[in-house]
Amino acid sequence: MNSSTSTMSEEPDALSVVNQLRDLAADPLNRRAIVQDQGCLPGLILSMDHPNPPVVHSALLALRYLAECRANREKMKGELGMMLSLQNVIQKTTTPGETKLLASEIYDILQSSNMADGDSFNEMNSRRRKAQFFLGTTNKRAKTVVLHIDGLDDTSRRNLCEEALLKIKGVISFTFQMAVQRCVVRIRSDLKAEALASAIASTKVMKAQQVVKSESGEEMLVPFQDTPVEVEQNTELPDYLPEDESPTKEQDKAVSRVGSHPEGGASWLSTAANFLSRSFYW
């Protein structure tokens, strides 16, 4: 990297910047503004080619959040280097399995954004088969677990929950639905949902139940056993940002920081984007 020591001492490192963008992208109210910003999306694309695996994984989580907004998908797909970088992550032999699955999921979403149903289905199946080939037989198809989390009632609790989930080996991505205290988690098929519950229980302030549908289609809450489950730690991921560094500490501030006030709010995104652009060439 060609950033000088003095520059790095005055500015946050690449991982911190990507983590902050990921945190902002976790809030649905921020997603359009981030994608419309001229520098953030290119910065995240550059992040996918970063030599530090945690930077790549965090950037993919941010992109996964952004892709949940349908209005963002066409622009994301057309952004220079987006699809090629996702392919590179999927095909690189040194990429961790969870990161490959996450990149494949984003690729599927963007690739199907403007295709006919039949073409979309065929392309997604082809992409999944290719991803599975590179993942190997131990990482079979991912599954989705919906959790109702008692105590998930503010941003600080969400950050605690994120920290716990990010440490679990086998977690691919997750999305919070704060209004109904839920978290939708994509995990490897060989990871048990009980591991998620144990990790959330380790926060001491939250408890998870699984949301399932009955035969009649009604949703039911199924409690997990109180017996702790041994969780395999994901040692490749970094410690989560401390609360005082998180730009989403308060929702209204996060929104204004993104785009409500051009002279103040958008400047943080511009600073972050400029830093990413300067730092990710090596």
Swiss-Prot record:
Gene3D superfamilies given in the database record: Leucine-rich Repeat Variant (1.25.10.10)
Modified residues (N-acetylmethionine): M1
Residues modified as Phosphothreonine: T137
Localization of this protein: Cytoplasm; Mitochondrion; Mitochondrion outer membrane
Higher taxonomy: Eukaryota, Metazoa, Chordata, Craniata, Vertebrata
Residues modified as Phosphoserine: S189, S246, S260, S267
Biased composition, class Basic and acidic residues, residue ranges: 246-255
Segments crossing the lipid bilayer: none
Segments for region (Disordered): 239-261
Annotated ARM repeat ranges: 39-81
Name this protein carries in UniProt: Armadillo repeat-containing protein 1
